[in-house]
Amino acid sequence: MKQYLDLLNRVLTEGTEKSDRTGTGTISVFGHQMRFNLDEGFPCLTTKKLHLKSIIYELLWFLQGDTNAKYLQEHGVRIWNEWADENGDLGHIYGYQWRSWPDYDGGFIDQISEAVETIKHNPDSRRIIVSAWNVADLKNMNLPPCHAFFQFYVADGRLSLQLYQRSADIFLGVPFNIASYALLLQMMAQVTGLKAGEFIHTLGDAHIYLNHLDQVKLQLSREPRALPQMKINPDVKSIYDFQFEDFELVNYDPHPHIAGIVAV
């Protein structure tokens, strides 16, 4: 995807070398935006192979409101293991905030359900926002949210989604984030009777870790291929009823996988 490769190039040419929480070191830029029109294909990176199984199961896990890594581990997904405690718990991370944001009356707000209902019944609202960045609850999260909040927008029968990501690990994390939120957009569009429009990805601190530079240069040497298509079971009508088997990525022909070490 040209949008992603342009981001890699920008960071390499314009970025500032910075220290970071993990001690690894990064090259970083502040503020970048990518746009993906889903009419042009599903934005799953082709310059290296992505592990789609992990992306799908993680999104379903978020939507269930689950915050324990055991569900992921049972399905062979290990991407959250580094931050889980001995019982698999991760604290009040994404799923908890999406589905059970605490209110001031002792109850909880299901932000996903509210977003679905607002898209259906008040599509011109400018308040269709889901936030994982709960300042009062950051201390209870094993990893504060990198992809912090997202907003939906309805126009001409099309549903679009914009994500703000405060911290973006461009080599390892961002390809997953692009595919995950594009998939969420398709799912939300289906259950609200709309067509999936555009996914807009806005990044805050966009960085390449110093131990990923060789992998990034290898990726930039590869020619992007045609985007695949994501087919979703049309019979699913609730955002909470999707199963792994309801998704099929067709015509995905990526270059080989490129390994990289996760900075913890």
Curated annotation (Swiss-Prot):
DUMP binds at R21, R126, R127, R166, S167, A168, D169, N177, H207, I208, Y209. The active site is at C146. Pathway: Pyrimidine metabolism; dTTP biosynthesis. (6R)-5,10-methylene-5,6,7,8-tetrahydrofolate binds at H51, D169, A263. One of its GO terms (biological process) is methylation. GO terms for cellular component: cytosol. Signal peptide: none annotated. SUPFAM superfamilies: Thymidylate synthase/dCMP hydroxymethylase (SSF55831). Its EC number is 2.1.1.45. Gene3D superfamilies: Thymidylate synthase/dCMP hydroxymethylase domain (3.30.572.10). It is found in: Cytoplasm. InterPro entries: Thymidate_synth/dCMP_Mease, Thymidate_synth/dCMP_Mease_dom, Thymidate_synth/dCMP_Mease_sf, Thymidylate_synthase, Thymidylate_synthase_AS. One of its GO terms (molecular function) is thymidylate synthase activity. The keyword Transferase applies. Keywords: Cytoplasm, Methyltransferase, Nucleotide biosynthesis, Transferase. It catalyses: dUMP + (6R)-5,10-methylene-5,6,7,8-tetrahydrofolate = 7,8-dihydrofolate + dTMP. Homodimer. Catalyzes the reductive methylation of 2'-deoxyuridine-5'-monophosphate (dUMP) to 2'-deoxythymidine-5'-monophosphate (dTMP) while utilizing 5,10-methylenetetrahydrofolate (mTHF) as the methyl donor and reductant in the reaction, yielding dihydrofolate (DHF) as a by-product. This enzymatic reaction provides an intracellular de novo source of dTMP, an essential precursor for DNA biosynthesis. Belongs to the thymidylate synthase family. Bacterial-type ThyA subfamily. This is Thymidylate synthase. It comes from Bacteroides thetaiotaomicron (strain ATCC 29148 / DSM 2079 / JCM 5827 / CCUG 10774 / NCTC 10582 / VPI-5482 / E50). The lineage of its organism: Bacteria, Pseudomonadati, Bacteroidota, Bacteroidia, Bacteroidales.
